[in-house]
Structures are given as C-alpha cells and as structure tokens.
A protein has these predicted regions:
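Extracellular and organelle-lumenal recognition/adhesion modules and their flexible linkers in secreted
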Residues: 26-270
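N-terminal carbohydrate-binding accessory modules
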Residues: 294-347, 451
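Aromatic-lined substrate-binding rim segments of carbohydrate-active enzymes
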Residues: 340-400, 406-407, 430-449, 482
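Active-site groove signature of glycoside hydrolases
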Residues: 403-433, 437, 454-460, 464-476
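Active-site clefts of carbohydrate-active enzymes
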Residues: 493-525, 552-554
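Aromatic/acidic polysaccharide-binding cleft in carbohydrate-active enzymes
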Residues: 518-573
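Carbohydrate-binding surface patches
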Residues: 598-635, 662
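C-terminal beta-strand-rich structural cap/linker in extracellular carbohydrate-active enzymes
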Residues: 651-671
Length: 671
C-alpha cells in the first residue's frame, strides 16, 4: 500500500481500541450517537501549552538544546509555542515527555503544529507531527501510534488520533518531531492527551454476516450476534446485566425472543436466537440492555429474508465470493500500469483479479474496465483516496462522498467490476468516515461487496461494521519472522468472528525499493511459503503486492529486464500451483484433524477433502529440513503424490515425507 512505509519505519502497527463501536446508521453504539468517544478525563500532559519555563526550557519536557526553544512570536494560544528547527537532516533528536497513561485505557491525543519549509526525507516518511510510544518496565520499545505528519509551509493545523494503550505497556511517552531526514522549522502548541470513554455497548452480526441477508428456509437457523459491553467506563463493573434479544416484523410483532444475563465481570457474549419459518421480508433484530428494570439502551440491526441473493457479486455463508452465481477465488495483483501489454501478461499468468491505484480523477475508468474485461480480469476498483485531508485526495471541488457517488454510478453495472476498495490502511480515526463511505456505496450498488486492507492488527475488530471483506498485508521479509503471515491471517479471521472473509496481501516486493539500503527481496521459497501460509490459515482470496514493484530495484530505480523476468517467472510458478488448488479451496471440506501447527510451530498444515481426494497443504516456516510423519484421519488413504507428480509414502495410516527449509507444498492422497 502507499502508506505502508510508515509501518517499516515505525516497526510496529498502531495499537488501539478495545472493542468495535458500531456506527452504522442502523446499529448506533449505545451511549451516544453524536461522538465516537466522549472525553472522560483531564489533559495528562504537563505544560502542554508551553507557558511554564525554567531557564528557557519548557517545564515537563525533554527538549534537545540547539533544536528546540520557546518562541514568543509563534504561539497557537497563550504566550509561547515550542520551536523545533532542524538544518542537519541527520540530527534526529526529539522532544519528549513521559505521560501517566493507564494500560488498557483509551486516549485522544492532539497537537497543534505550524510548519515552514519542511521537506526532504523519504517520500513516504515526511513532515512535522507527533507520535505516542510505549515500552516495558525495562525500557524496551513495544510499539506506538504514528499519526500522519504535515509537509511544507503551513499555518496552524491540528493533528489528532485515538489510541488504546496496551495492557503490557509500562512507560508511555508523547514525542514531537520532524520525521527522520527531514529539515525545516515546526512550531508546536496546545498538546493534549485525554482519556476518553467508548459507548456503552456495540454489536457485530455473526449470522447473517453479509449485510443482514438471510436465505429461506429459516426454520432451524439461528441469528447470532456478538455483544460487547464497556463496563468499567460506564460504572457497571460487578453489576449483572440482562440482554433481551428479539426479532420483530414491520409491525413490531415479536417473532422470537431470548434472554441472557451477563455476570458482573463479563464484557462480551455471543447471543443466539432460534428462528421460526419466516417469509421473505425485512425484519428488525433488537437487543435491549437492562440493569434490573432500567433499560440502559438498545442495539438494532436489519435482517432481510430472501429466497435467493440477487446481487451479481456477494459473499455467501461459507465466506466465498459468488460471482454471477458461481464461487470465485480471487488471485490478484496490485498494479499501477494498465496498458494492454501488462494486462495480457497478468491474465496469461493465471491471475483473475487486479487492483489498480492509478484510476481516479482525470483518467478514463471506463476504458480501463473495458481493457480488464477484454483479458478476463475482474477489477477491485479503488476509491480509497476519496477522503478529505488524505495525501492523494483529488482536489477538484467535490467532497469525497460526491466523488465516490460519481464513480459508483458510472461503473456499478460494468461486468468487470468485482468489488470496491474503500480503505488502504487508514487509521481508526477514519472509522466514522469509512462508515459513511461504506453505507453510501452499499446504497448505490448493492451488487458488489466492499474491501479494505489494514496492518493495524489489534484494531481489526473496530472495522467490522464498515466492511464486507477484511484484508491484511503482512510483509515480513527481511526484518520479521516469515510466520507473520500466519499470525496476521489467523488474527484477522478471529477479529472477523470467523464470519466475514479475510483476504491476504502476500509480499512479492523488495523492501529496499522503498527504504533504500541493501536489496533483499523474498526468495522464491519465501514467496511461495507466504502464499501457502495464507491459504492454510483460511484466506479466501490473495491479492499480491505488487506488480509495479517487480520493475523496480533499490530506491525505486528501474530494475534490469532480466531481474523483472526472473521475478515474474517465480510469481507465475506460484500462481499456477495455487490455481490447481482453487477447486478444493472453493468446494472442499476442511478436515478438523488436519488443521494447525506441528513440529513446535514450524510446520503449518491444512487438510481438505474434495472429490474423493485428500489435499494436505503444508508450509515449513523454519530454516530446518524436517522429516514429517503426519497421522491421517483414517486408514483409507493409500497413496500420495505432490502436485508436481512426486510420490510420497503412506504407511500405517500416516503420511511420511521430507520438507526442505521453507518448503511449501501440497500432497494429494487417494483411497
């Protein structure tokens, strides 16, 4: 993603909120609709306005001499602002203050900043702003939140973010700075960090998960919903709560009802409501939250009972994408160029999906869609830049929602359209705007789902109610363990309650393209391993990042033709193998006894039965050669071979094989 370089420079994703706060119009969070969070404390920053000083140094702050100073000529309010001037791009000293945050609590942090000629640095790591970081009791860095910074010359602007301090954090600091290798002058003032309270409760629909669509017949089915309660912030610790769930028709008649009591320490629960036979119609699912006879609030969702889903593209109960009535497994690429030469190459390689950043204002989207159609490619169309204030927002005199409306109305009926891409790693502060976008597009185009990609793994649950498909983009090579892919995939599936599909963005690029330094791209074995990990842990789609980086080398220089060809050959080989697995992935049944991690976390395995065959997907994430003896679910399986035809042993109800370091493979067993 464009903004992914912040991840690499910051080394860890943002750590934020505790629970999803549903902000859909029909599922407002209980406890206040006017704001996502409410301030519940005072500013914990000492001398955030820089009015107190001693010997020219602002009280409470660590301000490096020669860079930071009080400035009476530039204050947002009061007498002083803090001036931060850097002329040496290698002088990376910071203004800091340790702040008394409570682990597990949620805070709103904000800073007013003014800038003059702030420039240079990596194009992905520029500007003036602030961050919040935390460490353990020994001072070891654990993570942080890094709001977007501002570049150039500009008057006072406010930067803010919401952050949940992880429970393991012991020291928390706020940092004022210019990003690494930037020069220029910034002024800071009115720094605030204030504890905020989330709404009382929120809801996530688990079944039906896709837009409230429930297929007939309904008798014997259940509505399932996850309810989360913020007890501590609302003074409810130790108090039993009663949750009454009910399905009503348009006239308010009760059709099914259930009651569940949450004891004083329970903060979330899964409610299930048995259904009678329902006629196709719209219904209301309501959860009342009570303490004694007093109702604290209610949560509501619409349920639409239908005989069949009419949408051209939708997500079914197995989390598969259904396109024109048939299951579809997206194998795609992020790309920039869309000339026929590139689309022909991508299609010939076996990809079926593309996601292009480059089509927006000033382009010809219809021609792009027609080219994709010509080569049999489905398009995830990006509207991810249509948020005012973001780096690539088109300044054409229209709001983001107006731009989105224009593009959706223009393209919603095109046969090449697969889904809408509404978010590329935007932080949780954008959730209200993401929800507006999601609701608008859903109302204009009920025929296509919406997709977003995030690296903020602890926060994924927060986005549950403003997406149909969740994506994650783990890029471990070279600085992180390769099983980051399986960790992120599993975490995303858990965050989506195993109810909404997760697509994974495998890494096929070299980080040095963005960061500079020594080149170190993933090897063929590493790339294949990452694809396999995603599939083994339940990904329902793969959109690799990125085609355009295959043409680049360190520092975004053009790669030699032979380097591109080598990279492309490796990617094509992986995709050819994945395509052989697609029928089993779409139509097969998982084997519970063949799911998980073996050999002390080194080998990841998934078993799928399909058409009297047993497919066993394996990924060795270690640098060791491993001799594997895998017990089979029954002794009926007699022979085994890999997808390339190599035979393996089946002995005494066990599959016996050797896995090379980082090897990923599939064994197909027959009876």
């Amino acid at each position: 993603m464009e903004k992914m370089i912040n991840i690499g420079n910051c080394a860890t994703p943002i750590m934020c909120l505790l629970i999803v706060c549903s902000i859909l119009s029909q599922t407002r969070p209980v406890g206040g609709e006017s704001a996502f969070f409410q301030r519940s404390g005072e500013n914990i920053v000492v001398n955030g306005g820089f009015e107190l000083e001693k010997d020219g140094i602002p009280v409470g702050w660590s301000a490096p001499h020669g860079i930071a100073s009080l400035d009476p000529a530039n204050a947002h309010s009061g007498k002083f602002g803090l001036k931060y001037a850097r002329t040496d791009r290698n002088d990376y000293r910071l203004v800091t203050q340790q702040i008394p945050c409570i682990p597990g609590k949620i805070y709103e942090a904000s800073v007013w900043v003014k800038g003059e000629n702030i420039k240079d640095g990596d194009q992905w790591d520029q500007g003036a702003g602030f961050c919040i970081e935390w460490s353990d009791e020994n001072g070891k860095w654990l993570g942080g939140v890094y709001p977007p910074c501002i570049v150039g010359t500009f008057d006072w602007q406010k930067i803010s973010t919401i952050v949940r301090i992880p429970k393991e954090a012991r020291r928390v600091s706020i940092v004022l700075y210019l990003r690494r290798r930037n020069t220029g002058t910034a002024w800071f003032d009115d720094v605030e960090v204030v504890q905020v309270a989330p709404p009382l409760a929120s809801i996530q629909m688990i079944s039906p998960a896709y837009r409230g669509l429930l297929l007939t017949p309904t008798k014997g089915k259940k509505i399932s919903a996850k309810i989360s309660i913020n007890r501590e912030e609302h003074g409810l610790v130790g108090k039993p709560l009663e949750i009454i769930s009910e399905l009503t028709d348009a006239k308010g008649n009760s059709l099914s009802k259930g009651v569940k009591v949450l004891q004083g320490d329970e903060e979330e629960t899964i409610l299930q409501l048995a259904l009678p036979e329902l006629k196709p119609n719209e219904y209301q699912y309501v959860c009342h939250i009570r303490i004694g006879k007093k109702e604290l609030g209610k949560l509501e969702e619409r349920i639409n009972v239908v005989r069949q889903v009419e949408a051209k593209v939708y997500v079914d109960e197995r989390q598969r994408l259904i396109v024109d009535g048939k299951p579809f497994f997206p194998i795609g690429l992020y790309l920039g160029p869309t000339e026929e030469e590139h689309l022909a190459r991508i299609s010939e390689a076996g990809f079926n999906t593309i996601l292009c950043y480059g089509y927006g204002v000033g382009r010809d989207p219809e021609a792009y869609m027609e080219r994709a159609k010509k080569y049999g490619l489905k398009v995830i169309y990006s509207v991810k830049d249509f948020y005012e204030g973001t780096r690539y927002f088109p300044k054409v005199g229209k709001s983001g929602l107006e731009l989105a409306r224009d593009y959706v109305m223009k393209l919603r009926d095109h046969p090449a359209l697969l889904a809408w891409y509404i978010n590329d790693e935007l932080p949780i502060t954008f959730i209200p705007r993401l929800t507006e976008m999601y609701e608008l597009i859903k109302s204009l185009d009920p025929n296509h789902p919406q997709f977003q990609v995030l690296y903020q793994i602890p926060d994924l649950e927060l986005y549950y109610n403003c997406t149909d498909i969740m994506g994650v983009d783990p890029y471990p090579i070279p600085s992180r363990p390769i099983d980051m892919v399986s960790d992120w995939t599993s975490s995303a599936i858990k965050a989506m309650n195993n109810a909404k599909p997760v697509w994974v963005v495998p890494q096929i690029f070299d980080w040095s393209v963005y960061r500079g330094g020594e080149p170190r791209e993933p090897t063929f074995q590493e790339k294949k391993n990452m694809f396999y990990q995603a599939l083994i842990h339940g990904a329902k789609g793969l959109i690799a990042y990125s085609y355009f980086d295959l043409f680049k080398t360190t520092g975004r220089k053009e790669a030699p033709k032979e380097l591109f060809e080598k990279r492309w050959k490796e990617v094509c080989e992986i995709v050819a193998e994945i395509n052989k697995l697609v029928p089993a992935l779409l139509e097969g049944e998982d084997v519970p006894k063949l799911q998980g991690v073996l050999e002390k976390g080194k080998v990841h395995v998934r078993g799928i039965t399909y058409r009297n065959k047993l497919y066993i997907l394996l990924a060795n994430t270690s640098s060791d050669s491993l001799h594997l003896t895998l017990p089979l679910p029954d002794r009926g399986w007699k022979s085994a071979s890999r997808l390339d035809g190599r035979e393996e042993k089946v002995k005494n109800g066990q599959l016996v094989l050797q896995l090379q370091p980082l090897e990923a493979t599939t064994c197909v067993l027959s009876k």
